[in-house]
Regions:
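N-terminal, positively charged nucleic-acid-binding surface of large information/translation enzymes
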Residues: 1-129
């Protein structure tokens, strides 16, 4: 396929989705809330922000993302939030490994997760992070 540049095409659509706030869902009482529309909640296991995102994360979130897209296409209002399991031994070990305070190492890892998940095009409602 001559002239196909996936990075520019993906970047274009990611900017469109962000600009249109495509994956955001209004809460009751907010403009845009549709009371009669069926609701769905999709939540994958929360990742440990104790390192770099990897193909295992993509594998897990690809399934949840497919479910979220399927339900949207079938008329559901889908909440697909993001969160992190940032407590306990994995966070402590990562902080020790990086020589940083746990808050600093966790925040840096979360920033990398956000960057990578956006680049993958996962349909996360980032307002519900």
């Amino acid at each position: 396929m001559a002239g196909y540049d996936p990075k520019s095409i993906e970047r274009k659509w990611q900017e469109v989705w962000a600009g249109e706030r495509t994956w955001e869902v209004a809460n009751p009482g907010q403009p845009g809330f549709e009371a009669d529309k069926p609701k769905s909640y999709v939540l994958e296991m929360l990742p440990y922000p104790s390192g770099e995102p990897h193909v295992g994360h993509l594998k897990c979130y690809a399934v949840g993302d497919a479910i979220a897209h399927f339900r949207r296409r079938h008329g559901f209002e889908v909440i697909h939030p993001m969160g992190y399991d940032a407590f306990g031994l994995p966070a402590e070990n990562h902080a020790i490994k990086t020589g940083q305070h746990p808050r600093e190492s966790t925040n840096a890892a979360i920033a990398e997760f956000q960057r990578q998940f956006r680049s993958w095009g996962v349909s996360i409602d980032w307002t519900r992070e």
